[in-house]
Structures are given as structure tokens and as C-alpha cells.
């Protein structure tokens, strides 16, 4: 076997100051230069908006809206990231959509395509070899093919059923190479189409929330009081005849800041808070040792039902005359079934 010649080690030409700065020379980014870059990018995006063919865009939107199958998106490199993102946006809006890798498609994944589907190609140049190889295979599956390109007369546009031209004056990159404007245009185009489809389908806020159960908007429209309340052994419960001093552990150990006073049938009588404890101690002194919870509790507390939306519980806590930190949860006959706390609502992401 052959071998590589030994390296020639010459350290005399090394710029040690350059090494300290990461191995390359840098210039400061000035305020004016940065501002000019943003203005230039704005001008490039304005060129896109000014020259976009709305008739092409409308036809494309209607095809996506009317498809009875799945809308697949594909691309290579940075365009692949855009294609994937736009696809996921549509999925979040209850549209059947998916990203199709052009490489994986040629190794089995193209089996997902059917004659009812639409395949959308994101490509700046329209000359990407991987996408051109995919076209005849996708056509054999019967899918409708759409290219979104920025170069006129490109080969991909010529072999697809439809092309939408995304006008691009140039890239912001000083070499006109890095796809920093073309991808922005692709993203703006894709997301705007997604919103147009959303409006055409009359997607409701409730449907949107159902697709985002972990997000704040989803939780606010899905979670009910019964989903976030404490219950059973978590409740700081006592009877009205119990002495205040005998219930200090119950008052302080359940993390609710209160006692829930109930009768023998678990119907709510009132509440006694840690604030009530401080006020009673200040007003009564040693007499507090003989006072029962029932004598000092609030017999008209705010309450809420288990089927009420959790976000409404938060509003009720914050309503006049003064905010509260908790709400006892009762059913129709005032039987205590839980407690919802402000801390619990915040922890749930509401």
C-alpha cells in the first residue's frame, strides 16, 4: 500500500492574534450597515410581492383546496426545510399534508403517493437533479405535480403539470449565492397560501385549538375545571366544629392556602384561608385556641362548577371586588368535589 508524505510543519507563518480571534479576521458590524441590509432585504421582498402572478397563485390555491388526497411537499437543501415547515403548518390546520424526501421517495416512500394527491416541488433554480429524477416516478403514481420556482424557463417547470413563478430579483448574499432571500420568499408564499386555505375551510378557533392541545390557546379552549382541579385526598377539608388550631397542619400541608369547610354530607359550608388565620390571631390573641373554623370561616365564597372552562376559572379569580387564589369546585347540590388554584392554572399553562 502507498503512504502519504509526512506533513511539512512550518509554524513561522502562523498569526497568533488571528488564532485568538477564532482563526480569521473580523470587522465590526456597524449600525448603518445592518440597517442597510434590512432595507435591502425589504426591497427584495417587495419585488416579490410586486411581481407575483396572482392568477397562478389563485389556481394553485384552488388545487390544494379541492384535492381529495394528501398534499405532499418536497425540496432539497434549504428548500426542503421550507417544504417541511409549510407542510407542518397545513397539518396543524387540519389539512392532510406531509413532507416527501426526494431521496427516500426513490427508495420506497413514493408508495405513499396516489392519483388523488398533489406533490409540490420547492426549488429556486428548478434544475435540482434529485427533484428532476423524482418527477417521472411521481407521475407514474398519478399525482398532480406543481413546481414553485424562481428561474424562468427552468426544466422542472417544463415537466410539471403547473408552475408558480416566485419572483426573485437576487439573493441578499453579497455573492448572490446563499439562499437567504429565496427561502424567505418561499416561506412567505407557503404560509400565506396556508392562511388562505384556512379561511376557505372556515377553520374555527376550537378546531385549531384541538390541534394544539399543549399550547396555551389549545389549553384555554379545551381544558375544563375538572381537568386541572385537585380532588379527593388532595383537598384541605375540615368540619365547621373543628378547632382552628387543630387544623393548622391541614391548612398548611395541601398547598391550597385554605381550608374547605363541609358538613356531614360533604356539602360546602365555607372557606377559611391563611389570611383569615392571621387576621383572627391578630384580633383574638389567645382566644384563637378556643375558636372553631365554622365561627370564623367565609360562608359565601366564590365557587365554580367542574364543567366550566378552566380559563373562566382564572377570570373569576381575578374579578372584583378582590382577587382570590382558589375556587372550591362544587356540583349542582353544592357538594364539594375539588378545588382549583391559581398556581395550578398557571402550572397547566393557562
From Swiss-Prot:
Gene3D superfamilies: CBS-domain, Glucose-6-phosphate isomerase like protein, domain 1. ATP binds at residues 75-80. The record marks 78, 130, 171, 212 as: Catalytically relevant. GO terms for biological process: carbohydrate derivative metabolic process; carbohydrate metabolic process. This is Probable arabinose 5-phosphate isomerase. Transmembrane segments: none annotated. InterPro entries: CBS_dom, CBS_dom_sf, KdsD/KpsF-type, SIS_dom, SIS_dom_sf, SIS_Kpsf. It is an enzyme of class 5 (isomerase). Keywords: ATP-binding, CBS domain, Isomerase, Lipopolysaccharide biosynthesis, Nucleotide-binding, Repeat. Its EC number is 5.3.1.13. It comes from Arabidopsis thaliana (Mouse-ear cress). GO terms for molecular function: arabinose-5-phosphate isomerase activity; ATP binding. Coiled coil: none annotated. Substrate binds at residues 94-95, 107, 133-142, 167-169, 295. Residues 60-203 form the SIS domain. It catalyses: D-arabinose 5-phosphate = D-ribulose 5-phosphate. SUPFAM superfamilies: SIS domain. Belongs to the SIS family. GutQ/KpsF subfamily.
Amino acid at each position: 500500500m502507498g503512504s502519504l508524505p509526512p506533513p511539512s510543519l512550518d509554524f513561522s507563518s502562523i498569526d497568533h492574534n488571528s488564532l485568538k480571534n477564532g482563526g480569521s479576521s473580523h470587522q465590526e458590524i456597524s449600525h448603518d450597515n445592518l440597517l442597510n441590509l434590512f432595507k435591502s432585504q425589504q426591497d427584495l421582498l417587495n419585488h416579490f410581492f410586486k411581481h407575483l402572478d396572482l392568477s397562478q397563485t389563485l389556481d394553485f390555491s384552488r388545487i390544494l383546496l379541492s384535492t381529495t388526497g394528501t398534499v405532499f411537499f418536497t425540496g432539497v437543501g434549504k428548500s426542503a426545510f421550507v417544504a417541511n415547515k409549510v407542510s407542518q403548518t397545513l397539518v396543524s390546520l387540519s389539512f392532510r399534508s406531509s413532507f416527501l424526501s426526494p431521496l427516500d421517495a426513490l427508495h420506497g416512500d413514493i408508495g405513499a403517493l396516489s392519483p388523488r394527491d398533489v406533490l409540490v416541488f420547492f426549488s429556486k433554480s428548478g434544475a435540482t437533479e434529485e427533484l428532476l429524477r423524482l418527477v417521472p416516478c411521481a407521475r407514474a403514481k398519478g399525482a398532480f405535480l406543481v413546481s414553485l420556482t424562481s428561474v424562468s424557463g427552468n426544466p422542472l417547470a417544463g415537466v410539471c403539470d403547473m408552475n408558480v413563478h416566485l419572483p426573485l430579483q437576487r439573493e441578499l448574499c453579497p455573492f448572490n449565492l446563499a439562499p437567504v432571500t429565496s427561502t424567505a420568499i418561499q416561506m412567505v408564499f407557503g404560509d400565506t397560501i396556508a392562511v388562505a386555505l384556512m379561511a376557505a375551510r372556515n377553520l374555527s378557533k376550537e378546531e385549531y385549538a384541538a390541534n394544539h392541545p399543549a399550547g396555551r390557546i389549545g389549553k384555554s379552549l379545551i381544558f375544563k375545571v375538572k381537568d386541572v382541579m385537585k380532588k379527593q385526598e388532595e383537598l384541605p377539608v375540615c368540619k365547621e366544629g373543628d378547632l382552628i388550631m387543630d387544623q393548622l397542619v391541614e391548612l398548611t400541608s395541601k398547598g391550597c392556602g385554605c381550608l374547605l369547610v363541609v358538613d356531614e354530607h360533604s356539602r360546602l359550608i365555607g372557606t377559611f384561608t391563611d389570611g383569615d388565620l392571621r387576621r383572627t390571631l391578630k384580633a383574638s390573641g389567645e382566644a384563637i385556641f378556643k375558636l372553631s373554623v365554622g365561627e370564623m370561616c367565609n360562608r359565601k365564597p366564590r365557587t365554580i362548577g367542574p364543567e366550566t372552562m378552566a380559563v373562566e376559572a382564572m377570570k373569576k379569580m381575578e374579578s372584583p371586588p378582590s382577587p382570590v387564589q382558589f375556587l372550591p369546585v362544587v356540583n349542582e347540590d353544592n357538594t364539594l368535589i375539588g378545588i382549583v388554584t391559581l398556581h395550578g392554572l398557571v402550572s397547566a399553562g393557562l
